[in-house]
Amino acid sequence: MLRLDPGEGRIATTRSFEVWEGGGEYNVARGLKRCFGMDAAVVTALADNAVGRLVQDLIYQGGVDQSHLKWVKFDGVGRTVRNGLNFTERGFGVRAAAGCSDRGHTAISQLKPGDIDWEKIFGAEGARWFHTGGIFCALSETTPLVAREAMEVARKHGAVISYDLNYRESLWKSIGGQAKAVAVNRGLAPLVDVMIGNEED
């Protein structure tokens, strides 16, 4: 996902944004690589256009393995597939951070079981830890199924599974709200070794 940062300004009034790569799960992988020097990879899907290639370049700069990027043919306008955008205002003083997601019809939201070769990742390549969370699962009706598929294969190969509840009302609103988030999270919980959350999740 491409994150657009207006600096100290507001989304509604700024005239420029700085761009970063981002995403709840990706940020963990980047932190492990940049802060601790650990090998980390991201599994995601991007529309194959200039914005997708920008995200790829930013991931490269972050030092995260991108060999599991799934490229989806772009239709030229974004009717069928797009790359996710997240506009994020910084919080400081009494002003809370604020975000505006633009993530409908994204390549990652269209992932479905069978699209990713999890056996290769956890079997042949020997990945030892899998991390995902509520943001990915909120993107569509199929993303929780992809998370479950990955967890089942990871568990079979003895990898540790972590899950960040990371509840975002704006992402869950169109597919059932908090009740849907609770149902999805409870369904995945038995497969999780490390669950991360707080009283807001």
PLM features: residue spans?
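Alpha-helix C-terminal capping segments
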Residues: 20, 27-41, 61
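Short beta-strand segments at enzyme active-site cores
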Residues: 37, 41-44, 161-165
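Conserved beta-alpha-beta core of the PfkB/ribokinase-like small-molecule kinase fold
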Residues: 129-201
